[in-house]
Amino acid sequence: MNNYLILSDEVQRGMAQGLPIVALESTIISHGMPYPQNVAMAREVEQIIRDNGAVPATIAIIDGKIRIGLSDDELELFGSSKGIAKVSRRDLPQIIASKKLGATTVASTMICAHLAGIKFFVTGGLGGVHKGWETTLDISADLDELAQTSVTVICAGAKSILDLDATLEYLETKGVPVVGYKTKNLPAFFTRDSGLPLALSCEELTEIAEMIKVKWQLGLEGGVVVANPIPQEDELAPSYINGIIDTAVKEAEEKGIIGKDITPFLLGKIVEMTEGKSLEANIKLVKNNAKVGARLAVEFFK
């Protein structure tokens, strides 16, 4: 086991008992939602994973170590503290070396999960290709990580603040399977259907588990995206949310917000403009992903 990893007691017990472990990121807690809803969401999501037969492992960087599984106090710390670093692949060595607090993104959570031998990871939405990428080249490191790190990511598609068309094209170029679970089109985070058709879709988790096994047994390194739409009763009307997203993107451009600050800014702005409706939808879709992700992990290890 890597010297930089510390596994929580719950994760160690789960591994010893041969239970499936499901990773969770910490950026969603520190940068993706306001306090105290973020901490409540994190605890509820962990419980949903337990209730569906798997063991949750929220991942974060604390005091020069990669923590695989956080205590209640640590979840509270990540939810309520200001100035926690947002850590992607590029930032991991520096944040660990400097012993700072670091919240893991999709990319770095995949890396840490892989180091710990964890094959499944639940999140809200993927990062991807940002709108206006033709001039900024702003493409999330999440996509390249999926091309090289063998972890399955269960999400509600890519975040709808992104250029979803380009994101799907990029994943195709990198050979990353994007499987729609009970959907033939890519879900768009707050809404169930982006209108973009997927090459792969499955009605049953057993089919997805089998496909993932075959992929890795063939020596095809890299992740799999399981795109699981937000439940119908929780989705926001596309005509409503898409206009708000466009306004928020425009404001970010005007303010010159770029790089890793753009996603937290946009999500915060959208919560403000929807008077909290987007936050409620975000929490619901993460919980739904946790249920599906835990069940998929159980299926995989049968």
UniProtKB/Swiss-Prot annotation:
CC cofactor: Mn(2+)
Keywords linked to the UniProt accession: Glycosidase, Hydrolase, Lyase, Manganese, Metal-binding
Active site: E25, K159
GO biological process: nucleobase catabolic process
Binding site for Mn(2+): D138
Catalysed transformations (reactions): D-ribose 5-phosphate + uracil = psi-UMP + H2O
Endpoints of the signal sequence: none
Cellular component, GO annotation: cytoplasm
Any GO MF annotation of the entry: pseudouridylate synthase activity
Cofactor note: Binds 1 Mn(2+) ion per subunit.
Binding site for substrate: K86, V106, S140, A141, D142
PANTHER family the record matches: CARBOHYDRATE KINASE PFKB DOMAIN-CONTAINING PROTEIN, ZGC:136858
Assembly notes: Homotrimer.
Family: Belongs to the pseudouridine-5'-phosphate glycosidase family.
Name of the protein in question: Pseudouridine-5'-phosphate glycosidase
Record organism: Glaesserella parasuis serovar 5 (strain SH0165)
Native organism taxonomy: Bacteria, Pseudomonadati, Pseudomonadota, Gammaproteobacteria, Pasteurellales
